[in-house]
């Protein structure tokens, strides 16, 4: 996770990116 920033930590965009990255990794 290179986008581990406080700004993307409490935003819906960060969660979406996290889910997308998780899905792409699987």
From Swiss-Prot:
<comment type="pathway">
    <text>Cofactor biosynthesis; pyrroloquinoline quinone biosynthesis.</text>
</comment>
<keyword id="KW-0884">PQQ biosynthesis</keyword>
<comment type="function">
    <text>Required for coenzyme pyrroloquinoline quinone (PQQ) biosynthesis. PQQ is probably formed by cross-linking a specific glutamate to a specific tyrosine residue and excising these residues from the peptide.</text>
</comment>
<dbReference type="InterPro" id="IPR011725">
    <property type="entry name" value="PQQ_synth_PqqA"/>
</dbReference>
<dbReference type="GO" id="GO:0018189">
    <property type="term" value="P:pyrroloquinoline quinone biosynthetic process"/>
</dbReference>
<protein>
    <recommendedName>
        <fullName>Coenzyme PQQ synthesis protein A</fullName>
    </recommendedName>
</protein>
<feature type="cross-link" description="Pyrroloquinoline quinone (Glu-Tyr)">
    <location>
        <begin position="16"/>
        <end position="20"/>
    </location>
</feature>
<dbReference type="Pfam" id="PF08042">
    <property type="entry name" value="PqqA"/>
</dbReference>
<comment type="similarity">
    <text>Belongs to the PqqA family.</text>
</comment>
